[in-house]
């Protein structure tokens, strides 16, 4: 069974923990009092691998958004297979902040764009306007999904599972190539 390590990063109060809990089925509730993540939380769950009938164990690393944890980032990034950048579409400063997250967690790691996901998260009660976001050219290359767990939780789950299956598929192909190179 494959094991995929996916980081969930982004500015403080963007909804990273809510999304991590949601995708890993760690909790049923969506709302609640804000409690900032200290350092990192690791959630483990199985993700079915679509057409191959097998599954993959996913480690979802829910990373605290406070810059005081920056010294931990190299250790957190080590051996990661994917990065999800979460930001609040309701907080204008987040658009600028996610550029820093992209630089540190995607560009510096030289992660392929198909292993990255950008999520514009809407907090419960904030409406569902999907305004056009003014993203930098580097961020505009990433897949962007809008997340509103109140109105369309299954659409969000479907998009996240599609993203995770893509990572699992990449890992599988990589392993197959490695095995073939050993054989030949």
From Swiss-Prot:
Any one GO CC term of this protein is: intraciliary transport particle B
Q: Which ranges does the record mark as transmembrane?
A: none
The organism's place on the tree of life at top rank = Eukaryota
A Pfam family name for this chain? Roc
Question: Quick one: which residues bind GTP?
Answer: 10-17, 62-66, 122-125
Q: Which keywords label this protein? A: GTP-binding, Nucleotide-binding
The UniProt record lists the keyword Transmembrane: no
Q: Does the keyword Nucleotide-binding apply?
A: yes
One annotated GO molecular function is:
GTP binding
* CDD domains the UniProt entry points to: Ras_like_GTPase (cd00882)
Disulfide bridges in this chain: none
Q: Supply the Gene3D superfamilies for this chain.
A: P-loop containing nucleotide triphosphate hydrolases (3.40.50.300)
Family note: Belongs to the small GTPase superfamily. Rab family.
What name is this protein filed under? Intraflagellar transport protein 22 homolog
Ranked from the top, the taxonomy reads: Eukaryota, Metazoa, Chordata, Craniata, Vertebrata
